[in-house]
A protein has these predicted regions:
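His-Asp-centered metal-binding catalytic motifs of divalent-metal-dependent phosphohydrolases/nucleases
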Residues: 3-40, 47-58, 99
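Divalent metal-dependent phosphate-bond-processing catalytic cores, especially two-metal-ion Mg2+/Mn2+ enzymes
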Residues: 1, 12, 22, 42-44, ...
Length: 159
């Protein structure tokens, strides 16, 4: 495990949010981040996290809200759908999980899902996104051989 690489992906995955844009949905910040990192000379091993962190389970439909319902007409839709179809690396899965557990503090995935429901509402894909979030957490529990939350003592304060 390359810890510096994992940290770097964590630092840059949401870099597209630094740009101003009027479009709604996941695509704007994902694509702006991807293009920005590429413009700096980095390859897809780095830039790809800007896209892949927004979609669980290699599935363009696995999002936490329906703000992207109209994005099938987005110029980037086909590119993103194909791009995320490849198996995610362990690093990309770690960033997905961390993105789901962290806001201003570390949360259980259950509490993070409630946070997303509160802020975005319940949509057609919400149940699917919650199921995949729980599967991702269970994947890491299995990989570790114990409950992932044991790595985060501060989570006990949030239970």
């Amino acid at each position: 495990m390359n810890i510096d690489y994992a940290k770097t992906l964590g630092y840059i995955h949401d870099i597209g949010k630094k740009f101003k844009y009027n479009e709604k949905g996941v695509f704007p910040h994902a694509m702006k981040g991807y293009k920005y990192i590429k413009s700096l000379g980095y390859d897809d091993d780095y830039a790809g996290i800007c896209i892949k962190h927004s979609f669980l389970n290699n599935d363009i439909d696995c999002i936490s809200n329906d703000r992207d319902e109209t994005d099938k007409s987005n110029e980037n839709y086909d590119f993103v759908k194909q791009y995320i179809s490849k198996e995610y690396s362990i690093y990309e899965k770690i960033i997905n999980l961390c993105d789901l557990m962290c806001t201003t503090k570390v949360l259980t995935v259950d509490k993070r899902m409630i946070d997303l429901l509160y802020r975005h509402g319940v949509y057609a894909k919400t149940h699917y996104h919650i199921e995949e979030t729980i599967k991702l957490k269970e994947y890491f529990d299995s990989l570790l051989g114990y409950n992932l939350y044991d790595l985060f003592p501060e989570i006990k304060e949030n239970l």
